[in-house]
Amino acid sequence: MASEKSQNVQDVFLNHVRKSKTPVTVFLVNGVKLQGIITWFDNFSVLLRRDGHTQLVYKHAISTVMPGAPIQLFDATKPEGDLGRDTAAYSDE
């Protein structure tokens, strides 16, 4: 068995946009569009900051998260399927 932790693409994606402070557009299942920077997330929710205000958004209400700039999650030098990112810390705090 490999000693590396298995990482899911959702955590890798959210951690990447959080660490890089990439602006995102979050579309909710009811059609509402939210924009801001993800400052924290866990298994059930995301904190989204914009203009000094923070919103707690529950993941079950999210349809799509679209980054405001192109991102690269996968390291082309690593084997296919290796996300190559550390997701141990999910907060900027």
UniProtKB/Swiss-Prot annotation:
Which GO biological process categories is it annotated with? regulation of DNA-templated transcription; regulation of RNA stability; regulation of translation, ncRNA-mediated
State the UniProt keywords alphabetically.
RNA-binding, Stress response
Read off the InterPro entries from this record: Hfq, LSM_dom_sf, Sm
One molecular function GO term is: RNA binding
SUPFAM superfamilies assigned: Sm-like ribonucleoproteins
Q: Name one Pfam family in it.
A: Hfq
Domain Sm span(s) in chain numbering: 11-71
Keyword RNA-binding in annotation: yes
Q: Which GO terms describe its cellular component?
A: cytosol
Specify the superkingdom: Bacteria
Briefly, what is this protein's role?
Answer: RNA chaperone that binds small regulatory RNA (sRNAs) and mRNAs to facilitate mRNA translational regulation in response to envelope stress, environmental stress and changes in metabolite concentrations. Also binds with high specificity to tRNAs.
Family stated for the protein in its record: Belongs to the Hfq family.
Q: How does it assemble?
A: Homohexamer.
The protein's name in its UniProt record: RNA-binding protein Hfq
Organism the protein comes from: Granulibacter bethesdensis (strain ATCC BAA-1260 / CGDNIH1)
